[in-house]
Amino acid sequence: MKSSKFTSTPLFPRQALVALLLPLIAEQALSVTIGLADTLMVSSVGEAAVSGVSLVDSFNTLMIQIMSALATGGAVVTSQNIGHQEPKNAKAAAAQILFVLSSFSVLVAAVVIGGRHAILRGIFGSIDADVMRYAETYFLLSALSYPFIGLYNAGAALFRAQGNSKISMLSSLVMNVVNIGGNAVLIYGFGMGVMGAALASLVSRAIACAVVLYLLQKPGCALRVDSLRAMAPNGGLIRRILRVGIPAGIENGMFQIGKLSVSSLTSTLGTAAIAANAVANTTTTFLNIPANAVGMAALTVVGQCLGAGEKEQAVYYSRRLMLTAYCGAWVMNLSAFFFANRFAVSLFNLSPEAQAMALDIMVWFNIVSLFVWPSSFTLPNILRAAGDARFTMTVSIVSMWAFRVGFCYLAVLCFGGGLLSIWMGMYLDWVFRSLCFYLRFRRGSWLEQSVI
């Protein structure tokens, strides 16, 4: 059935979009729960434990973002091949992204396990002995989970590329149930503290990885990868994947390196500031869930539209997705502003000073996010889905070093600013990114990109 909006059959009618988006929103909520559960349960050990976990998680996020970027490259190539009605090439791309992610994650895990102390000292410098002790314990077990995270990200991205977001949602549900149950037993039952939280996360990620890989090799899977032979390196396909994956990986990597630089700056403000920053980061992540989910859906929707040669539909669905992202941002942030911020902060075992810092940050986050978060982070996924990853990389790197890093160091070291000034630098970064991505989208040059 043709729609009056298009000259051809719509690729994603309302029911298909809802079926794609709702599981992604649920998956994002479940994913964020792992970080919240760890921080909440570890907070019972004290601020030093929260700080140690927070510092390591900032590095973990760097690794996870790079692996997610590589998975994004595979998802874009696979989505465009699906839209172009080339199932054989789509399956081949699926196998290659598993090869790329498994190789990368094992290599990174080996480096971190061998050099975790030097990495922590190099990034964060001189921190309290208790914080360092907790951080080293958490870092070791986190590194062991990297291969599971990499393969899980690859498998989940491939299911989303097919338009099947229920699989990644269900595997995320399993991961969270195991993680929270493990936290309860190991932290409260056996008194293992930070080590218990890290072990629970490791086991939960391994199980989620096993579930996704099992489903990916089942006969009914459209992107079935049923043997190690299928994962033999294919230079041509790897180059196509990396054409999106490398710029996205550099972008995400540099973005997280910038955040690590700022975390290093935050660590000079004292344990209360580190703890407040950790809690604010964890709680505000919940507010981005709808817009993040829309960004993930955009890789599938826009990728398949452009693979099918339907530029008109790509533009239409992009606008529709952005409207959805903004609606989600307004609902979440206004709800937090009026009802949830103070309650969320009270859940953590923070000093009065740290609580006050966290509340100030969260209020400003609510206000700024209403206007620029979706265009800063959801919109670039639309451009990446077209293969326009170099532009998003360039804008993100320039903006991050100029505002998120440059402004923050200037504000703190030269003008004596505190934790709030660091977050203000981040908001300036969002505004600049939003403007650049909006202009790129409006001019339409992203529609001329292709990765197949």
Where are these predicted regions, by residue range?
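Small-residue hotspots at the loop-to-helix junctions and early N-terminal turns
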Residues: 47-58, 135, 139, 198, ...
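Hydrophobic transmembrane alpha-helices of multi-pass small-molecule transporters
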Residues: 62-65, 179-183, 209-213, 286-289, ...
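Short runs within selected transmembrane alpha-helices of multi-pass transporters and secretion channels
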Residues: 71, 141-160, 168-176, 197-212, ...
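Residue-level signal for short hydrophobic patches within transmembrane helices
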Residues: 14-33, 37, 59-66, 144, ...
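Short alpha-helical transmembrane segments in multi-pass integral membrane proteins
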Residues: 1-24, 78-145, 189-246, 302-369, ...
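Transmembrane helical elements of multi-pass membrane transporters/channels
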Residues: 19-35, 141, 175, 204-208, ...
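Small-residue-rich hydrophobic transmembrane alpha-helices
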Residues: 50-110, 149-168, 274-340, 373-396
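Helix-terminus/linker motif at the lipid-water interface of multi-pass membrane proteins
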Residues: 29-51, 120-129, 185-192, 253-286, ...
